[in-house]
Curated annotation (Swiss-Prot):
EC number of the protein: 6.3.4.2
Active site: 382, 508, 510
Positions with a binding annotation for UTP: 14, 189-194, 225
Name of the molecule in the record: CTP synthase
Keywords: ATP-binding, Glutamine amidotransferase, Ligase, Magnesium, Metal-binding, Nucleotide-binding, Pyrimidine biosynthesis
Stated family: Belongs to the CTP synthase family.
Span of domain Glutamine amidotransferase type-1: 293-535
Function: Catalyzes the ATP-dependent amination of UTP to CTP with either L-glutamine or ammonia as the source of nitrogen. Regulates intracellular CTP levels through interactions with the four ribonucleotide triphosphates.
Organism (species): Clostridium beijerinckii (strain ATCC 51743 / NCIMB 8052)
Gene assigned in the entry: pyrG
Binding of ATP, residues: 15-20, 72
Length: 536
């Protein structure tokens, strides 16, 4: 069977959930025995989101092969339970950069380089490359932005051309739109959807399926009206109601017949669907018996999407412990030693996530100090691990100005320092320690207890590391080195003795957590928080 292609576009407004729609379809097709892969096209000119502010873009999701990508790839991986690659996220910047590099090398033989065909061909190559690399039945591609955005036009033209190249029977266009409900009028308005589809058809794309985000159910009459004016069958108009939990969305879209429509359009000959595992998981999520409150002490807490994988991983850890996780968001700039007790006294665990720069550092250190001294379950991630080492050096070893050389280049005690291979790097984009690396765990540690493995593999995104010049002093003072690189050169995990759960890791465990396969560190952390809750 030739590879099939599904393209998911969006209209009316952004943030409609195209990514969740694509991920949900991927899950449904996988549950029908179809081999799938998903990719995201982002129309911005950045080569990748690695240097973008979290306030601009939300979380940067890192793949096994070290690509810094859009947060939607996190949704894709969590839903389809497969690891993606750098080819799964393509930006305008990446496309233009590759085309210009080819032009400089003379690969266009002196021809005039244009958007059509050179940019569009490069975009199409990225779609075909995923099909080739992954040996899949279906490639699902989400086009970022909304129809009508000038930045999206080369991508839309490219997916229009793909239909001509591979045949109409091998392509399905899904358009996600908004059907707003006007409370005063008491009716759903279909005109925005009609105009969005009109815009799409003007550039040569006729959607096969329209997924309508709505807060009210669409009647058959409303679906028929949308179908009539958008030139599709009424049953190809799918409602996507707001869900209490993201993981309900695949089941809701299945009940609307989305996967059946795609299988019919692409002549996939799918097996009967087996959603039993997913249904069981969703039912479990709806009936959690316990509750814990976790403080998330970060610098971007106003935008929860900046920590979306951490939030999801905490929830996954809760599912494994039959526990609902409530997050108490604490701005690291608002916490200090004098008010830590007041801000943290009602929580069952404290998590300090990753980040960059000096803003909020002292607040993170204050939260970690309180967690250590009050024996409150603590999980530090990336910068959170570095802050844990700094706090320990200051409070236990008495190195009052201990710091990271990132924060204070003049510190007398740079317990966190720039990695040697990072010292001569000038460009910021794509130059950190990125992607999957192995780690050897020490026995008789919390980390070894939860992983139950000597060698683990986790994803990294950092430039700074534990400074080995201080390893002897810090370990002799009671901080355990619980995990290192296999050559023991890099410290990856630290723990504190005589504490119920104090684990800080240099890597990002949240990036590998899945709802059906919660990450073991988060399972252990929430278990410790639950024990803390029950001991009150």
């Amino acid at each position: 069977m030739s590879t099939k292609y599904v393209f998911v576009t969006g209209g009316v407004v952004s943030a409609l959930g195209k990514g969740i729609t694509a991920a949900s379809l991927g899950r449904l097709l996988k549950n029908r025995g179809v081999k799938i892969s998903i990719q995201k096209f982002d129309p911005y000119l950045n080569v990748d989101p690695g240097t973008m502010s979290p306030y601009q873009h939300g979380e940067v999701f890192v793949t096994d092969d070290g690509a810094e990508t859009d947060l939607d790839l996190g949704h894709y991986e969590r839903f389809i339970d497969e690891s993606l690659t750098q080819n799964s996220n393509v930006t305008t910047g990446k496309i233009y950069s590759s085309v210009i590099e080819k032009e400089r090398r003379g690969e266009y033989l002196g021809g005039t380089v244009q958007v059509i065909p050179h940019i569009t061909n490069a975009i199409k190559d990225k779609v075909y490359q995923v099909a080739k690399d992954r040996d899949v039945d279906v490639v699902i591609t989400e086009i970022g932005g909304t129809v009508g955005d000038i930045e999206s036009q080369p991508f839309l033209e490219s997916i229009r051309q793909i239909k001509s190249e591979v045949g109409a029977e091998n392509v399905c266009y899904i358009h996600v739109t908004l059907v707003p409900y006007l409370g005063k009028a008491g009716e759903l308005k279909t005109k925005p959807t009609q105009h969005s589809v009109k815009e799409l058809r003007m550039i040569g794309i006729q959607p096969d399926i329209i997924v309508c985000r709505t807060e009210k159910e669409l009647s058959d009459d409303v679906k028929a009206k949308i179908g009539l004016f958008c030139n599709i069958d009424g049953r190809s108009v799918i409602q996507n109601l707001d869900a209490e939990n993201l993981y309900e969305v695949p089941l809701m879209l299945h009940s609307e017949g989305l996967d059946n429509l795609v299988c019919e359009k692409l002549h996939l000959g799918c097996k009967d669907i087996d959603n039993s595992e997913w249904i069981q998981m969703v039912q479990k999520i709806k009936n959690l018996k316990n509750n814990v409150k976790i403080a998330l002490v970060g610098k971007y807490v106003e935008l929860h999407d900046a920590y979306i994988s951490v939030v999801e991983a905490l929830s996954h850890g809760g599912y494994a412990n039959n526990t609902n996780v409530e997050i108490k968001w604490i701005n690291a700039e608002n916490i200090e030693n004098s008010n830590a007790q007041e801000l943290l006294k009602d929580v069952d665990g404290i998590l300090v996530p990753g980040g960059f720069g000096d803003r909020g550092i002292e607040g993170k250190i204050a939260a970690i100090k309180w967690a250590r001294e009050n024996k409150k379950p603590f999980l530090g991630i990336c910068l959170g691990m570095q802050c844990a080492v700094i706090e320990y050096a200051r409070s236990v070893l008495g190195y009052e100005d201990a710091n990271s050389s990132e924060i204070n280049p003049g510190t007398n005690y740079p317990v966190i320092d720039l990695m040697p291979d990072q010292k001569d790097i000038e460009n910021l984009g794509g130059t950190m320690r990125l992607g999957l690396y192995p780690c050897r765990l020490a026995e008789n540690t919390n980390s070894y207890e939860v992983y139950k493995n000597e060698i683990i593999n986790e994803r990294h995104r950092h430039r700074y590391e534990f400074n080995n010049e201080f390893r002897k002093q810090i370990t002799e003072a009671g901080m355990k080195i619980a995990g290192t690189s296999p050559d023991e050169r890099l410290v990856e995990i630290v723990e504190v003795e005589d504490h119920p759960w104090y684990v800080a890791v240099q890597f990002h465990p949240e990036l590998k957590s899945r709802p059906n396969k919660p990450h073991k560190l988060f399972v252990g952390f929430i278990k410790a928080a639950l024990e803390e809750n029950k001991s009150k």
